[in-house]
Amino acid sequence: MRLSSMWLCSLLLILKLQLSSTYPISTGLTDTDMDILKVLLSRLEESVSEQMAVDQSAPGQRDLLDSLSTEDAGDGPQPDAGLDEAEIREFLSAKNLKSVRNDSSRRSSGCFGRRMDRIGSMSSLGCNTVGRYNPKQR
């Protein structure tokens, strides 16, 4: 009985796989939706080909625009010219980055992160620890 039921289940499974592969899963798009997408795709291809033709026919104009933009940029004031390179290095130094990372507002948040000295001590781990033992206060 067990062998026949297993054989029947495997036959049904194979049949199910064959039937499901013959009918593709519907994408939810109708024929009109597909037609609209095809029209949009063809319009996109046309506009891209037109733009490529314009770009290839006018390389001299692009060079002219690039030269004008570099000349305009040179005439204006430089925004970062007043900063000294040493000041920039000092601002980005590891000491300053460490002080940002060890900000006192983070250390005194009151929620986790305080140090536990030994097992059983009141270490103020957790939230709402106002008024509890703090070894720094003594």
From Swiss-Prot:
It comes from the Eukaryota. Residues 50-84, 99-138 are annotated as: Disordered. One of its GO terms (biological process) is receptor guanylyl cyclase signaling pathway. InterPro entries: Natr_peptide (IPR000663), Natr_peptide_CS (IPR030480), Natriuretic_peptide (IPR050787), Natriuretic_peptide_brain (IPR002408). It comes from Oreochromis mossambicus. It holds the Pfam family ANP. Disulfide bonds join C111-C127. Belongs to the natriuretic peptide family. This is Brain natriuretic peptide. SMART domains: NAT_PEP (SM00183). Keywords: Disulfide bond, Hormone, Secreted, Signal, Vasoactive. Cardiac hormone which may function as a paracrine antifibrotic factor in the heart. Also plays a key role in cardiovascular homeostasis through natriuresis, diuresis, vasorelaxation, and inhibition of renin and aldosterone secretion. Its main location: secreted. Residues 1-22 form the signal peptide. GO terms for cellular component: cytoplasm; extracellular space. GO terms for molecular function: hormone activity; hormone receptor binding. It is found in: Secreted.
